Amino acid sequence: EYAEKNPETYLVLSGGKGPDEPVSEAQAMYRYLVYNGVRPGQLLLEEHSVSTVENLAYSKLLIESHREMIRHEREERNHLKFSREPKENYLIAADKPLEVGVLTSNFHVYRACMIAKKWGFENVYGISAQSDPVLFIHLCVRECASIIKDRIMGNM
């Protein structure tokens, strides 16, 4: 629904493939979203990451590359000698300040947003998805250890 109401928004699906997984996390999300009506053109896949730090680092590179491609396509259209389209002097999505919503499990939002800021995402918004209530305490304890590790490693 959000993607339909916001057609200029791109959804970056980030996550690699584990040894026991038939497809990458990004590919699984892609299939789910397309099946549920999201336009494939709004989806960018990052399929190489194996950690939260890599999710955000590789996603940033993918976003920057995509924004540059959009700018280049616009410049190409504007430089076509016989183009019937008027010159585009308005802001397109690639020119607007980047706003990033990080959708992740509720226990993971804080660390993901802090890592995103460390990687240069300025306008970061956490969007939480509910976790399994039975596993929630276990996941929070594990996440605390990951926060300490990422602080020590300089990832956040």
Question: Model segments located where?
Answer:
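A transmembrane-helix-recognition feature enriched in membrane-embedded lipid enzymes
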Residues: 136-156
